[in-house]
Amino acid sequence: MTVPKEAEGLIGSHYRAPDYFEVGREKIREFALAVKDDHPAHFDESESAAAGYPDMVAPLTFLAIAGRRVQLEIFTKFSIPINIARVIHRDQKFKFHRPILAHDRLYFDTYLDSVIESHGTVLAEIRSEVTDADGKPIVTSVVTMLGEAAHQEADAAATAAAVASISAGKLGAI
């Protein structure tokens, strides 16, 4: 396994998402329904308070909503030499520093920790440090993406089209 030539100098790169993600009570409720998490603390502030939370608490996987948007931006900002139309989410680890609550503003600082290539396949490890408006940590996420290698001859327009298609939820459209 080697570092792809196109990735030299990218490892350690930092990207701060240009805007925060504001956590809304209704988004928490909608997400909890979508993932079939029926814990009452995701639907009722009094239940959250009874469980010891200062506001409505989000399900643990709620970060996926904002995280997906940031993750797609990463592939274009870092120019990772991977064919975005042929990539899978291989692994993800979370370290929760505190629960995500209604009215939180989530800020994403994302780092490209490693990129390796072997036999035409690229593994990229991306770490996101999610903080609140005061800069205090909420969640650390480390995701490993696996995909077909894309080299200099790869078309930037094709990458942009793949990102747009994935964003629109058309996974098989490419």
UniProtKB/Swiss-Prot annotation:
UniProt-recorded Gene Ontology molecular function terms: (3R)-hydroxyacyl-[acyl-carrier-protein] dehydratase activity
Gene Ontology biological process terms from the UniProt entry: fatty acid biosynthetic process
Domain MaoC-like per the UniProt entry, residue ranges: 11-131
SUPFAM superfamilies linked: Thioesterase/thiol ester dehydrase-isomerase
Short name of one Pfam family: FAS1_DH_region
HAMAP family found in the cross-reference section: UPF0336
Family named by the database record: Belongs to the UPF0336 family.
Protein name in the entry: UPF0336 protein MAP_3996c
Biological classification of the source: Bacteria, Bacillati, Actinomycetota, Actinomycetes, Mycobacteriales
